[in-house]
Amino acid sequence: MSRIKIFDTTLRDGEQSPGVNLNKAEKLEIAKQLEKYGVDRMEAGFPASSKGDFESVKQIAETIKSSSVIALARAVKSDIDIAYEALKGAEKPAIHIFLATSPIHMTYKLKKSPEQVIETAVNMVTYAKERFDEIEWSAEDATRSDWNFLAQIIEKVIEAGATVINLPDTVGYTTPEEYGKLFRFIKETVPNINQVALSCHCHNDLGMAVANSIAAVENGATQVEGTINGIGERAGNAALEEVAVALKIRSDYYPFETGLILKETKRTSDLVAKLTGMYVQANKAVIGRNAFSHESGIHQDGVLKNTETYEIITPEMVGVSSNTLFLGKHSGRHAFKDKLKEFGVELSEEELKTAFEQFKLLTDQKKEVTDDDLYTILMDIKTDSTVVDKYKLIQFGVSYDTAATPKANVILESPNGSLIEATQQGNGSVEALYKTINYLIAENITLVDYQINSVGGGKDALAESHVQIIINGETINGRGSAQDVLQASAVAFIQAVNRYYVQKKANLTRLVYES
């Protein structure tokens, strides 16, 4: 079996999804889980785009040991220098340099001739080679580029020191047969291609990102790039968990394997969904909640007799298990700490104290506390940002009557420590609550999206709310959890506002580039 390397770009390409704005702590938690998942390489960010991205890449580089940590850079010396500084503490640093090669990009974006593009690519790879042993070079918009020109520029950048060549389908334009032919052409045409690894990077605009990735592997690609849950700009990227499971399940047909630890799939997927606010659709392949459900009576009968009649993927393979009671209201601190070790989450003494207190409060309200409940508490604590003073929810009440307009009263602690209170009406309980919070905060806020989900099951399940707001022109996501739906909704809205102030203080302006 040939080994296919997995290049995860959830923290870079995935974070370019509209409204996704992970803080430094959230990015680090995702990076640590990606390492547990077994990704070979993770693209931690684009350090030249902002101070925040630089600091995040630097922290991840200093933390991750087994996976290679990669920084994105344009074909510009200053970007390469900044990437080098961000990755100084990495065990396995690498740089990813991209430059457009399609006629439309060279003419209208770069305003360079093909000869000038080759010269720039060679010069920047040569410059990067003085700082990095591992260099990935991407031909942006490769699938709309002239194939002969691609072969020419690839040969030159390999001579300059590139170690990985990436042929991205930047706009999700290609098809499996066509993409496979491109890889075969490059393998057969570029004389020094065997000196490097060949990588694919597919977007999902036509719904073929995973199929295109597998077609590339069949035709010489030794690395697949993508994201967890397939998140990303526009229609997203190739879902890495789908690629890995497809190769595993169809190992009878595909002589390839990855190094992913598939039983970590569910945990990884859930974490990314929770922190980005991009929930996994119920019928998503491999990891959707309906992936192992059977509605048809014929199907149910078959599965009961032999699961292999209709299930080609077992829940256990991807880490799906039933939630069970693990701790109760009489559980002590020692038992609680033992349970945390199973999650592999490290807490400071202060964080442990906070987590245990929240757990005890939850056991007063819930008869059964599940792994999902506890993991939600832990992630809320681990990913909290304390960069600036914030608004805090002190108290709220909502009055609802079918014969009257809902009314909400809210008391907040403002960033300066003073208590502020207001009452507003709305067409529903949530609207009344949000109108009151908005009135107290006194910013130009528009609610774009609101979601509420249960964590685990049962009538006393923990509620988790995700909101997306536009505040003074900035799109921000927020997340909140509580046993009460309205409390979770209020916490999510306030968290989104606080994130806006964190970003505003840090003055994080981001440059977004596709590859």
UniProtKB/Swiss-Prot annotation:
Keyword NADP: no
One Pfam family per UniProt: HCS_D2
Pathway info: Amino-acid biosynthesis; L-leucine biosynthesis; L-leucine from 3-methyl-2-oxobutanoate: step 1/4
Key words of the record: Amino-acid biosynthesis, Branched-chain amino acid biosynthesis, Cytoplasm, Leucine biosynthesis, Manganese, Metal-binding, Transferase
Domain Pyruvate carboxyltransferase, chain residue ranges per copy: 4-266
Cofactor names: Mn(2+)
Keyword tRNA-binding included in the entry's annotation: no
GO biological process, one term: L-leucine biosynthetic process
Record EC number: 2.3.3.13
InterPro entries: 2-IPM_HCS-like, 2-isopropylmalate_synth_dimer, AIPM/Hcit_synth_CS, Aldolase_TIM, LeuA/HCS_post-cat, LeuA_allosteric_dom_sf, LeuA_bact_synth, PYR_CT
UniProt subcellular location: Cytoplasm
Catalysis performed (reactions): 3-methyl-2-oxobutanoate + acetyl-CoA + H2O = (2S)-2-isopropylmalate + CoA + H(+)
Xref: PANTHER family: 2-ISOPROPYLMALATE SYNTHASE 1, CHLOROPLASTIC-RELATED, HOMOCITRATE SYNTHASE-RELATED
UniProt-listed NCBIfam families: leuA_bact (TIGR00973), PRK00915.1-3 (NF002086), PRK00915.1-5 (NF002088)
Protein name: 2-isopropylmalate synthase
Native source organism of the sequence: Oceanobacillus iheyensis (strain DSM 14371 / CIP 107618 / JCM 11309 / KCTC 3954 / HTE831)
Source lineage: Bacteria, Bacillati, Bacillota, Bacilli, Bacillales
